[in-house]
């Protein structure tokens, strides 16, 4: 079994989801959201995200990590802050020795619901289909689980291609 953490980075809320995969099977382990205090300065908020994610990685001991890529919007300040939160989301698992993969939002949706553009409710429904025991509160945790599933599908495809080349 390979344990994967998916991370949906955000300065206010960073979602995380842990799954295990073996072949085509997926198993829900845990999910949640790390929040930062909007009344604190940026550095302190980033520390809150770092410490919260480090605790999750330490507690659940994933083998690999996947983080959603950011999109650039018209608000440059918001994009920069999201980029800083994303840096934390990549740094924490990397410092724990995990390989960190990155996926575009449309690749995540395609892996979970079959198309690159879809509604949050479609993702929630498919998470329950793929992992009936999955529990998630809010979009951030659901998105993080979807990111982990996307990585599980992609790592399986890569492993299959490597096996075909070797054999």
From Swiss-Prot:
It is an enzyme of class 3 (hydrolase). The gene is ruvC. It catalyses: Endonucleolytic cleavage at a junction such as a reciprocal single-stranded crossover between two homologous DNA duplexes (Holliday junction). This is Crossover junction endodeoxyribonuclease RuvC. PROSITE patterns: RUVC. It comes from Sinorhizobium medicae (strain WSM419). Its EC number is 3.1.21.10. Binds 2 Mg(2+) ion per subunit. It is found in: Cytoplasm.
